[in-house]
Amino acid sequence: MTTLTRQDLNFGQVVADILCEFLEVAVHLILYVREVYPTGIFQKRKKYNVPVQMSCHPELNRYIQDTLHCVKPLIEKNDVEKVVVVILDKEHHPVERFVFEIAQPPLLSISSDSLLSHVEQLLRAFILKISVCDAVLDNNPPGCTFTLLVHTREAATRNMEKIQVIKDFPWILADEQDVHMQEPRLIPLKTMTSDILKMQLYVEERAQKST
């Protein structure tokens, strides 16, 4: 058994690669399952050895990719606490918030076999849970949109400003109404614990969705 710090083997970069790839798949699947966009813009693919739905819409894909591209350096430095997919009604009030809580251990204890051996299996379980989450959620009103929020640790502010200059992708402070819902229903979906990553996914659902 070997103990490593986060600096060894460029550990932060490994976690960021894994997590950003997963989050891209997860966001597409949430948008499909919750019918934020017409089903016709999605195509069936295979990720983590299970079928998923991925958007074919260039502008939508670019927004998701650009956001995660800018989040990636923050994950490398362990500056990200949450990534949130917020589904908004026509009045831009949140009806659902899919919250991915992320934590990375400061030390790793790994065996001689693969560092990542169990992680893909755990992420597959998240994807399968998202695929059937509509069974525990109420229907959303028509005409919904979405936005991606990133909750960072306080020390991340300077890093975000640097990334904004380099990537030419503006970070905007989230509106209070996007961040909070009054007395939402909380639905836990999945939790994982591995040597390199801990993650929890839950949904905050607005009690009254009709507009």
Curated annotation (Swiss-Prot):
<dbReference type="GO" id="GO:1904667">
    <property type="term" value="P:negative regulation of ubiquitin protein ligase activity"/>
</dbReference>
<keyword id="KW-0227">DNA damage</keyword>
<dbReference type="GO" id="GO:0005634">
    <property type="term" value="C:nucleus"/>
</dbReference>
<comment type="function">
    <text>Adapter protein able to interact with different proteins and involved in different biological processes. Mediates the interaction between the error-prone DNA polymerase zeta catalytic subunit rev3l and the inserter polymerase rev1, thereby mediating the second polymerase switching in translesion DNA synthesis. Translesion DNA synthesis releases the replication blockade of replicative polymerases, stalled in presence of DNA lesions. May also play a role in signal transduction in response to DNA damage.</text>
</comment>
<feature type="domain" description="HORMA">
    <location>
        <begin position="13"/>
        <end position="203"/>
    </location>
</feature>
<dbReference type="GO" id="GO:0042772">
    <property type="term" value="P:DNA damage response, signal transduction resulting in transcription"/>
</dbReference>
<dbReference type="GO" id="GO:0042802">
    <property type="term" value="F:identical protein binding"/>
</dbReference>
<dbReference type="Pfam" id="PF02301">
    <property type="entry name" value="HORMA"/>
</dbReference>
<keyword id="KW-0131">Cell cycle</keyword>
<comment type="subunit">
    <text>Homooligomer. Interacts with rev1. Interacts with rev3l. Interacts with fzr1 (in complex with the anaphase promoting complex APC). May interact with cdc20.</text>
</comment>
<dbReference type="InterPro" id="IPR036570">
    <property type="entry name" value="HORMA_dom_sf"/>
</dbReference>
<keyword id="KW-0805">Transcription regulation</keyword>
<keyword id="KW-0498">Mitosis</keyword>
<keyword id="KW-0804">Transcription</keyword>
<dbReference type="GO" id="GO:0031145">
    <property type="term" value="P:anaphase-promoting complex-dependent catabolic process"/>
</dbReference>
<dbReference type="GO" id="GO:0031397">
    <property type="term" value="P:negative regulation of protein ubiquitination"/>
</dbReference>
<dbReference type="GO" id="GO:0009794">
    <property type="term" value="P:regulation of mitotic cell cycle, embryonic"/>
</dbReference>
<dbReference type="GO" id="GO:0043393">
    <property type="term" value="P:regulation of protein binding"/>
</dbReference>
<comment type="function">
    <text>Inhibits the fzr1-APC complex activity during mitosis. Plays a role in progression of mitosis.</text>
</comment>
<dbReference type="InterPro" id="IPR045091">
    <property type="entry name" value="Mad2-like"/>
</dbReference>
<keyword id="KW-0963">Cytoplasm</keyword>
<keyword id="KW-0132">Cell division</keyword>
<keyword id="KW-0539">Nucleus</keyword>
<dbReference type="InterPro" id="IPR003511">
    <property type="entry name" value="HORMA_dom"/>
</dbReference>
<dbReference type="GO" id="GO:0016035">
    <property type="term" value="C:zeta DNA polymerase complex"/>
</dbReference>
<dbReference type="GO" id="GO:0045893">
    <property type="term" value="P:positive regulation of DNA-templated transcription"/>
</dbReference>
<dbReference type="GO" id="GO:0042177">
    <property type="term" value="P:negative regulation of protein catabolic process"/>
</dbReference>
<dbReference type="GO" id="GO:0051301">
    <property type="term" value="P:cell division"/>
</dbReference>
<keyword id="KW-0206">Cytoskeleton</keyword>
<dbReference type="GO" id="GO:0005737">
    <property type="term" value="C:cytoplasm"/>
</dbReference>
<dbReference type="GO" id="GO:0033138">
    <property type="term" value="P:positive regulation of peptidyl-serine phosphorylation"/>
</dbReference>
<dbReference type="GO" id="GO:0005819">
    <property type="term" value="C:spindle"/>
</dbReference>
<protein>
    <recommendedName>
        <fullName>Mitotic spindle assembly checkpoint protein MAD2B</fullName>
    </recommendedName>
</protein>
